A protein has these predicted regions:
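Conserved short beta-strand edge segments in small beta-sheet-based binding/regulatory domains
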Residues: 32-40, 68-85
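Short, intrinsically disordered low-complexity segments
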Residues: 31-67
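Short amphipathic alpha-helix segments
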Residues: 10-34, 66
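Generic cytosolic/nucleocytoplasmic N-terminal low-complexity/intrinsically disordered segments
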Residues: 2, 43, 64, 78-79
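Short glycine-/aliphatic-rich beta-strand segments at the starts of folded cytosolic domains
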Residues: 2-13, 45-47
Length: 85
């Protein structure tokens, strides 16, 4: 079973549809990453993320991929990023 974490990003200056697509595309870029429950509202982007078939995934594992993806796809400048269980 995939262990899923809550990801919350606070940012400004992004289009809601583009932010939704940005999150979904992250699941395509990282083939083993699962993304669900995407919610974009106001200046917040939230979703659940985990790695398929891995029950030993940590918050740091998700954060590392998220930071890498943020660097590769600069749709917005995050003000605050959190990953929690």
């Amino acid at each position: 079973m995939t262990k899923m974490y809550n990801v919350n990003i606070e940012a400004e200056g992004f289009d809601t549809n583009e932010a939704q697509e940005w999150v979904n595309e992250m699941g395509n870029v990282y083939a083993d990453m699962e993304v669900s429950d995407v919610n974009v509202s106001g200046n917040k982007i939230s979703f659940k993320a985990g790695f398929s078939g891995m029950d030993d995934t940590t918050e740091d594992d998700i954060r590392m991929k998220l930071d890498e993806y943020l660097t590769m796809h600069e749709l917005f400048q995050p003000k605050n990023v959190s990953v929690t269980s």
